[in-house]
């Protein structure tokens, strides 16, 4: 049976007991409105083959990561439906932590994390306060739950890289695991914001993953990007690029070759959609 907790003291009581029982604590942070992509994070937690893990899913629409004019107020909040989905999933979530903003920030967000240079590009350029909010709440969740493992989806690839950076820079005793990006039957990357799309916009959104698949057939960085842009001609592309898995910037003598990601954000109607795909970058022929 899944416990639903709303206070820090409640979830800490459960995690203290789990730690006392020598059970590894696994945290899956989400904002709710669960879909199959979120459920796959639970499957990833169990794929770690830990001994009797205590699995927590946090469901919290974090106001710190939304800027003025974004969809904080309209973001779907479906705790009862989320709990029902978890109850019927084939792998158990032992506790849901669903705090209020007042519970997480009783005196307001007085102390926040500055993510650094890697957060200034791509999502950070469009949403300059976003990653400070993400890293602040993730760090709080790590401290509250005292988790040893945390699962994050690879759809938000820049976010995953920044969380790994924070863990390394702050020497946090947490193993961060990426869970593969999940797609719907039509190839669209699973996202809670897909619910905003009209039927016509949904058809348009399919072009994004199709473009990335076409781009991944190429191996020179310029050709990869050009193929994706051509395949998404006429779409409202925010950014598209090929990046290192850790989002480090290539330098002279240390160019990006080998395993990489093509990442993009595209606006379809009023909805910004993120997607990415693994690519292999080779040196161009002389």
UniProtKB/Swiss-Prot annotation:
Q: In which pathway does it act?
A: Cofactor biosynthesis; (R)-pantothenate biosynthesis; (R)-pantothenate from (R)-pantoate and beta-alanine: step 1/1
Q: Which GO terms describe its molecular function?
A: ATP binding; pantoate-beta-alanine ligase activity
Q: Which reaction does it catalyse?
A: (R)-pantoate + beta-alanine + ATP = (R)-pantothenate + AMP + diphosphate + H(+)
Q: Cellular location of this protein? A: Cytoplasm
Does the keyword field hold Nucleotide-binding? yes
* Residues forming the catalytic site: 38 (proton donor)
Q: Which Gene3D superfamilies match?
A: HUPs (3.40.50.620), Pantoate-beta-alanine ligase, C-terminal domain (3.30.1300.10)
Q: Which family does it belong to?
A: Belongs to the pantothenate synthetase family.
Supply any other comment. Answer: The reaction proceeds by a bi uni uni bi ping pong mechanism.
Q: What is this protein called?
A: Pantothenate synthetase
